[in-house]
Amino acid sequence: GTVEEMDQYINFADQWKDAEGNSYGIGYMGNAQGLLYNKAVFEAAGVTELPKTPDELIAALQAIKDNTDAIPLYTNYAAGWTMGGQWDAFLGAITTGDETWLNQKFVHTAEPFADNGDGTGAYALYKILYDAVAQGLIEDDYTTTDWEGCKAMINNGEIGCMVLGSWAISQMKE
């Protein structure tokens, strides 16, 4: 149908049109990427403010390790999709400030994973994960993680946080 026809039912329909004003698809959800965390675990570790920088996040994870029995950062590595899909979702505008970087510039960048030296880009993102692993701030055996089991674990205070999107909140509440 035309964008004008859809506009009365769908927000932002004008953003889903071709040059002739036709739309061939409808977005069905929105998602915010971030850290899903257990507030009680962070508080028990003495972390009273959410981390705002990579260094603050690593420090918070270390505090969880030092002051609780919880796994600071649960990677869900064995599931596979939780590593690529969730971490990679931060690439682009979130890590570079450039909304065109991932879909238009990434493939034309000579060294897209190089350290930009300013805390931005793919290197900075994956360095967070590298540092967490190197410092023992993830599960002991990441090859045996359990996606379904982690839902109860975070609710029971056995996990500090996980990199997930807002879509996961309802699953963790179940």
Q: What annotation goes with each model-predicted range?
A:
Residues 1-9, 40-52, 153, 160-161, ...:
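Extracytoplasmic "Venus flytrap"/periplasmic binding protein-like
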Residues 1-32, 97:
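Hinge/lid segment of periplasmic solute-binding proteins
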Residues 1-8, 93-124, 174:
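Short, solvent-exposed loop/beta-turn-alpha elements that line the ligand-binding surface or hinge
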